[in-house]
Amino acid sequence: MAKHLFTSESVSEGHPDKIADQISDAVLDAILEQDPKARVACETYVKTGMVMVGGEVTTSAWVDIEEITRKTVREIGYTHSDMGFDADSCAVLNAIGKQSPDINQGVDRADPKEQGAGDQGLMFGYANNETELLMPAPITYAHALVKRQSEVRKAKTLPWLRPDAKSQVTFAYEDHKIVGIDAIVLSTQHCDSVSQADLIEGVMETIIKPVLPAQWLNKDTKYFINPTGRFVIGGPMGDCGLTGRKIIVDTYGGMARHGGGAFSGKDPSKVDRSAAYAARYVAKNIVAAGLADRCELQVSYAIGVAEPTSISIETFGTGKVSEEALIALVRQHFDLRPYGLTEMLDLARPIYQSTAAYGHFGRNEFPWERTDKAEALRADAKL
């Protein structure tokens, strides 16, 4: 039997890079709410006592960048200067300008269906059948741990928790089937008064055990809870944060390839985001249809051109039909032009802030997680 380990990590909504992602997507949502056809590329930088919001926007909307920023930081939980970051006293700098007309002329068309891609690039979508969500287990449970940390913190179940946290989970596999969890890392920011012993017990009993399936834990599973022994200074006081620096956390935890483009702060005309969502939609429906146990789809674009420049599929030896047949089915059932995929997934609306923490995939509230094409794919594959 072939044995291997695979590790994925996640970070909480209070991690500096995720603060930046959430602010960028909060700005995007506020603009799309007023102007669904807006062009938005919003980048955020956070550091002790300050937030800088920049980028390029073309819109008829007006939004209050400062108020959106403060509200987002407040909801995350940075509300007092003893955390090193306070929503009500931090400086907010606005450096947003207009989108280049050179880009705009390549994207907009008289016929909306011929809308060109907002940039060149390559995107990947992935699905497998090792969880009910058709997502890899390591990233799924890494997200679940930090999401649980946030829930426990906001409920004040463990009142010494602070917003910044990271998780990492190592799964053991035999012949690509999960046989257990080898190691768990959870580091959480905390107030100065809690003892290491109380912290370890609280995290184990209140965060780790309720989240991870008991059948995957055994006497050899290793636990690393705040392994440095102290994590009082965190958030933007500990590290600066930037939009788009957690692209592997945002996607498949490293189990699939990545085209390099970040998601947050980008409207659906940016195929870095919208085509990656569509690629996940395609891959998930292929796996849901039983056409493969694992599926990775790559799609690529040229700026100003509507049709993808390439579509390729890898099923890692698990496909029930040829990859050429799968590509033909994809072309038949999915419109991967920028306008088509925006319509197919109803992307021109304010749904993005909630994507900006705990992963963009494997969450059934999002339209790219539907499996409504699976039955038709299976029928046309004649399985």
Swiss-Prot record:
GO CC, any one term? cytoplasm
Name of the featured protein:
S-adenosylmethionine synthase
What segment(s) does the record annotate as region Flexible loop? 99-109
Biochemical pathway: Amino-acid biosynthesis; S-adenosyl-L-methionine biosynthesis; S-adenosyl-L-methionine from L-methionine: step 1/1
Q: GO terms for molecular function, please? A: ATP binding; magnesium ion binding; methionine adenosyltransferase activity
The encoding gene is: metK
Could you list the residue ranges forming a coiled coil in this record?
none
Q: Principal place where this protein is found?
A: cytoplasm
List locations, semicolon-separated: Cytoplasm
Its recorded reaction(s) are:
L-methionine + ATP + H2O = S-adenosyl-L-methionine + phosphate + diphosphate
NCBIfam families with a match to the protein in the record: metK (TIGR01034)
> Where is ATP annotated to bind?
H15, D164, A165, K166, R230, F231, D239, R245, K246, A262, K266
Subunit composition and interactions: Homotetramer; dimer of dimers.
What HAMAP family has UniProt attached to this entry?
S_AdoMet_synth1
Q: What cofactor requirement does the entry state?
A: Mg(2+); K(+)
